[in-house]
């Protein structure tokens, strides 16, 4: 009996751990089916295994009750949407109410009295259970703004608290799982301050979808990117800024879901020759063939646009843009999606939100890179990686720019960046526009240099930026992006073998199962998962002492060298150096900086996390970490130049905006493309 209880306890612990996995929240719009030709998308076209949560946008409201937008939604789209759960039992579906075009007046009326809110809540539970939704998403843009009175900020909180109470009560009475409750919120600071009590929302909601896009658009007089990952000093708007702002105000990181758009914002340039970031613009570019909205292109339309356009990469913001004549579009692609996904993982946010699933290349017919080329990247990094037995990739795309943490042990770099501390957002976010100086939370190297683990520099062909503390890239290397295209930030190519392969310097690291490494001129082949054995299964004999790493353990018995099965053995009183600490034969400790240590017997190569003194009659466990590792908290330089998927390419290494539109015009929507319905 006690064994059964122990087993149940272990299962519960594992389930709790699974619950900490990243969410991938994807919106699907009820007008996607009305687009012409191959752009028409229905729920059965969606992949039920791609996202962890699917949200149907939008429901409407009538007489303080939630209702389907039209009869077709209720009779066809709702059933087809929720039928996806028959193929994936883990999938959760939610119904969203609101949107930009919904306005605020009906929300205000419903929120105004307890009786109205009670009526709304009863209708919500009834509609969700009738159509087999798992929860409700509130898309109120925005309490206290756009005609909504200031007290809506507080009545909105009352509604959320009352919804949660009713959901819990209904779950107890029906013995069904509690309905989920989420909300879509602005990422613009002045809207956040006006519309939300961040701590209260963070405490009550199951997750919070931060709309960290529509940060720039054709309502402005200068070009700017729709959803840059990081900020520039003259323009703090960015996805990282928005996420760190919510966290700084008290929202739990694990509940914050970063919004990532599958569309771009377009501009019409004043002059075709002035086509960079912050170039003068005179309005929106032409509407897309399928979305038919000025200043806006879905990703599947952007694929056609960029074939004949000049493509550029915005350094420090990690997003692309393209221009063709006087038309300019700032958009996201598979590379920028991967950067954003790794940022989410590095900063321990709850996951990613996609607006929208139906604006990706759903069938793979427009872009030629397979179905859902953008969202698949997020799934690969945020969802499948959580349950994979493979080790994490050898690169962490996590610049300290816009980061909320500072690494005090970061390697010193002689040339750094200078910024005005007054523009730093919550969490120590910083940006850069020129080439030399110093910033607290950022390690930057000038052109032609990169930082190595031994604090030496090596030549690099292009401008480099040192990434965060978990970056494990050296030199100008190439990565393969999540099973898709091979991206080449430097001038060397990476081809995935199994999972990843990397080139550092002149040596090749080829993935065999999990990892294999070539330090010096030796080839190490993994045995099991992370242990390493030198070439031809021969032991390493530095200084006359033989060590044969076979698995995770070493053992010394009396005065003899023994090599038992699945164990490695070293002679007595042998000092094994480590990444951080070595124990000398006299029992003293001393730090290591990459060099070998000499004991009474000989000199040994670096192994694992701890240097151990092997004495007679002692049995000691070595770390199960990979034998060859870089020191922790070591930031390495990363070459930011990418070779794009399509055609020609240039990189914006240094941007000096002419103007800094720090806030949107009041008459222009902050998220005007949140829905494209009439």
Curated annotation (Swiss-Prot):
| Family matches, as PROSITE patterns | GH18_2
Protein name as catalogued: Oviduct-specific glycoprotein
Q: Where is this region: Disordered?
A: 524-544, 581-606, 651-678
**GO cellular component terms, semicolon-separated:** cytosol; egg coat; extracellular region; intracellular membrane-bounded organelle; microtubule cytoskeleton; perivitelline space; transport vesicle
Which residue positions carry a glycan here?
402, 441, 580, 596, 648
What does the record say mutating residue 662 to H does?
Answer: In a colorectal cancer sample; somatic mutation
Keywords, in A-Z order: Cytoplasmic vesicle, Disulfide bond, Fertilization, Glycoprotein, Signal
Q: Where is the signal peptide?
A: 1-21
Residue ranges with Polar residues bias: 528-544, 651-662
Where in the body, by tissue, does this protein show up? Answer: Oviduct.
Paired cysteines (S-S): 26-51
Query: Which BP terms does GO give this entry?
Result: carbohydrate metabolic process; chitin catabolic process; female pregnancy; negative regulation of binding of sperm to zona pellucida; single fertilization
